[in-house]
């Protein structure tokens, strides 16, 4: 019985890659210094080898993103980056990822329904593909030099094309799969080099097989792997899927592919896939059974997994069953060893990446008759304690959440009348300007927060320092003449963790970091029990900020769906139950802010879209409870209180009616990196009556947009949106940027809004 890991986190146990990247981008270190991060790879390879894993992945390390690595491998560099051929280096690679002073970055979007982001390839009929990055082969050779024979992992050719988009100037209807014949020769070159280097297995990640694919897309898999079959001769080939069930038609296509040795499935989220396997699995093929959750931090229920694996063993045979993770461990934290302060009982319920590889191997050994009772017994005890712990169960919270069913929780007055009442109170100009919430977090500010937590500075010193920072942010916004202000969130390290720390039912890690994009990591809270709010969370800071200005000051909250989707969520009850509990806690906070005189309250639902199930058949149920949760938070406020929400990654065309159904007064949406895809919804006739602020510039790039560029973007919006509902704002919070970038960008944004106001007044 063998063991396999789909992929492993890249950042390192203490985020070594993050700091190396940021040092390189800031010009403080060399390319050679950055390349030393390959040492992280060596540590991880040894970790998996020492744990007894047989099939260890390589080429899952990346300096930014595995899809971008594939774009580099294929030489599919958009012309604006002025790449002239040859091996793609850091300059071109990071320009594609982040933009540079003269050109914007490529689009970034969610990787399926995770909080990881990939760089979307821009393709068309004129792309001249060439083998331009030998990373996959080089990493295999480096691992081999360390004495570890690995399974090189490539993003599969069909998923790569399905996840791409037509480049600028290419018809939106361009059939991306028509490029298969152009990219397969490069895959053949890579395969040939891997064979020559001594590889015996190769893994193609084809996660799009879990989506609702059309027949021509499924046919592309048959075509691609038939074309690659002779090149793959002599290699054992695994096709890996993850994140959901594989639909029956895709399962049939996948398991019928010739020349493929094994198939990997997510059996944590894929209960229906197990039924398909029971209904028929090709004889002589390997089944890589993903029974250890790659996306969460809960210890595996080993007894339950053994039962599942034994049933599968009866179908495929002992020598063809491989125990695996459900997905890459990229989506979980790195190592529990780095959590000495975590509560011991809660810690016993958890497993991070380093622990999950041990679980995988323990399951594989148990199936061969070598069950390690010293490992299995504590696991069984932890599973039992989690079910019965009073820390998990709060009857009052469960009753309050259950009482929510059967009501719409909708504000009585319609949005149009509410906006009129709010305008009378707020007296804003047309095209009002605002920002999304956070302002840059300086080294000094982080030091203050860091020293307050272990009480190296007093509460009085801490409050004084944070108030000074808020005052600085307020004064800057007033100087810039922004209409609706924010306090800049200097007291917050993270928009979810900040709230979770003040809610019951949450636990926190010191080093539970997970990559979001590039060097950006998040440290998701762990929701282990029923959720409630013991006391107000933001009222003190919001009222302090409002006292510093006559302009409206937004109260800033994170919405229940985003808290849910950006946390490691308990897996012992439905997600919607947990979401309703969080919604009730946020509702209490909204009402306390209103009582304290805050007239504009933003409830961010940045992650609403990313929680959307991968299957269309499951969308309606998710959207129903997600939108309902948002409405619960603000159903009790007055008509004159303006409720804002913010959303990230504006691929919203398919859920626009649910967004309208949220019944917010104003929605701001990240839009600038998606070529105004959002605006196409309104061009197609969808009527939106609330305020809306599609982002006018990309905060993920250091590039400072000109006034003319922003004005041009606003004009495009005015072509499809009413003047009286359009807001002008950046597309996301400014926390990760520097003041030297933020100030001129906001100056240009306000100037663009004023320019348009003047032009609109003249036109009247």
Curated annotation (Swiss-Prot):
Signal peptide: none annotated. Gene3D superfamilies: 3.20.20.210. It catalyses: 5-methyltetrahydropteroyltri-L-glutamate + L-homocysteine = tetrahydropteroyltri-L-glutamate + L-methionine. Its EC number is 2.1.1.14. 5-methyltetrahydropteroyltri-L-glutamate binds at residues 18, 115, 494, 517, 520-521, 566. The keyword Amino-acid biosynthesis applies. L-methionine binds at residues 436-438, 489, 604. The active site is at 700 (proton donor). Zn(2+) 1 binds at residues 646, 648, 670, 732. Pathway: Amino-acid biosynthesis; L-methionine biosynthesis via de novo pathway; L-methionine from L-homocysteine (MetE route): step 1/1. Its cofactor is Zn(2+). Keywords: Amino-acid biosynthesis, Cytoplasm, Metal-binding, Methionine biosynthesis, Methyltransferase, Transferase, Zinc. The keyword Cytoplasm applies. Belongs to the vitamin-B12 independent methionine synthase family. HAMAP family: Meth_synth. Catalyzes the transfer of a methyl group from 5-methyltetrahydrofolate to homocysteine resulting in methionine formation. This is 5-methyltetrahydropteroyltriglutamate--homocysteine methyltransferase. It comes from Plectranthus scutellarioides. The gene is MET.
């Amino acid at each position: 019985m063998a063991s396999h890991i789909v992929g492993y986190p890249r950042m390192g146990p203490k985020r070594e890659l993050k700091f190396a990247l940021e040092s390189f981008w800031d010009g403080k270190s060399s390319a050679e210094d950055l390349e030393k991060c390959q040492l992280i790879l060596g540590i991880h390879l040894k970790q998996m080898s020492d744990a007894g894993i047989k099939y260890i992945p390589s080429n899952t390390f990346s300096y930014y993103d595995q899809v971008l690595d594939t774009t580099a491998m294929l030489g599919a560099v958009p012309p604006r980056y002025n790449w002239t051929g040859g091996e793609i280096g850091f300059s071109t690679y990071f320009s594609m990822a982040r933009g540079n002073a003269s050109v914007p970055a490529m689009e970034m979007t969610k990787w399926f329904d995770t909080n990881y982001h990939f760089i979307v390839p821009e393709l068309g009929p004129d792309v001249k593909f060439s083998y331009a990055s030998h990373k996959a082969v080089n990493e295999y050779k480096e691992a081999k030099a360390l004495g570890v024979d690995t399974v090189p992992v490539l993003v599969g050719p069909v998923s790569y094309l399905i996840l791409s988009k037509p480049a600028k100037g290419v018809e939106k209807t361009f059939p991306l799969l028509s490029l298969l014949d152009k990219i397969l020769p490069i895959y053949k070159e890579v395969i040939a080099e891997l064979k020559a280097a001594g590889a015996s297995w190769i893994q193609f990640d084809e996660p799009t097989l879990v989506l609702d694919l059309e027949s021509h897309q499924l046919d592309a898999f048959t075509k691609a792997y038939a074309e690659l079959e002779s090149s793959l001769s002599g290699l054992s080939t695994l096709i890996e899927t993850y994140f959901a069930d594989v639909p029956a038609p895709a399962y049939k296509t996948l398991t019928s592919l010739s020349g493929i040795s094994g198939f990997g499935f997510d059996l944590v989220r894929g209960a229906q896939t197990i039924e398909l396997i029971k209904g028929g699995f090709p004889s002589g093929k390997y089944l890589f059974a993903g029974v250890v959750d790659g996306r969460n931090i809960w210890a595996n229920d080993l007894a339950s997994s053994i039962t599942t694996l034994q049933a599968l063993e009866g179908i495929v045979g002992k020598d063809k069953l491989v125990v695996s993770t459900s997905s890459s461990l990229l989506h979980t934290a790195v190592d529990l060893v780095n959590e000495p302060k975590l509560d011991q009982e809660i810690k016993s319920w958890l497993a991070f990446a380093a622990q999950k590889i041990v679980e995988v191997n323990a399951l594989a050994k148990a199936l061969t008759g070598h069950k390690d009772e010293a490992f299995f017994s504590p696991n069984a005890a932890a599973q039992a304690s989690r079910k019965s712990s009073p820390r998990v169960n709060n009857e009052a919270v469960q009753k309050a959440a259950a009482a929510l069913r059967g009501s719409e929780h909708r504000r009585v007055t319609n949005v149009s009348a509410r906006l009129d009442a709010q305008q009378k109170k707020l007296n804003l100009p047309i095209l009002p300007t605002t920002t999304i919430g956070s302002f840059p977090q300086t080294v000094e500010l982080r030091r203050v927060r860091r020293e307050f937590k272990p009480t190296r500075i007093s509460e009085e010193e801490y409050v004084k320092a944070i108030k000074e920072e808020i005052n600085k942010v307020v004064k800057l916004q007033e100087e810039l003449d922004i209409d609706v202000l924010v306090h800049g969130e200097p007291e917050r390290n993270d928009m979810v963790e900040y709230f979770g720390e003040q809610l019951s039912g949450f636990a926190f890690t010191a080093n539970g970091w997970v990559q979001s994009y590039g060097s950006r990591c998040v440290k998701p809270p762990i929701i282990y029990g029923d959720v409630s709010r013991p006391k107000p969370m933001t009222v003190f800071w919001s009222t302090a900020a409002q006292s510093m200005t006559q302009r409206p000051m937004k109260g800033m909250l994170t919405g229940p769906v985003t808290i849910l989707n950006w946390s490691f969520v308990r897996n012992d009850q439905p997600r919607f139950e947990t979401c309703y509990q969080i919604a009730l806690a946020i509702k209490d906070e909204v009402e306390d802010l209103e009582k304290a005189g805050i007239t504009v309250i933003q409830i961010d639902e940045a992650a609403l879209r990313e929680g959307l199930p991968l299957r269309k058949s499951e969308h309606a149920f998710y959207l129903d409870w997600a939108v309902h949760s948002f409405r619960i938070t603000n159903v009790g406020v007055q008509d004159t209180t303006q409720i804002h929400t913010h959303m990230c990654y504006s691929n919203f065309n398919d859920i626009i009616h649910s967004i309208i159904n949220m019944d917010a007064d104003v929605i701001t949406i990240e839009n600038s990196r998606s070529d105004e895809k959002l605006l196409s919804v309104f061009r197609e006739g969808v009527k939106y009556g609330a305020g809306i602020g599609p982002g006018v510039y990309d905060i993920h790039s250091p590039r400072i947009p000109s006034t003319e560029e922003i004005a041009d973007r606003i004009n495009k919006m005015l072509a499809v949106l009413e003047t009286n509902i359009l807001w002008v704002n950046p597309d996301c919070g400014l926390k990760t940027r520097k003041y030297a970038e933020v100030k001129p960008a906001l100056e240009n944004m306000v100037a663009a809004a004023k320019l348009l106001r003047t032009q609109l007044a003249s036109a009247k």
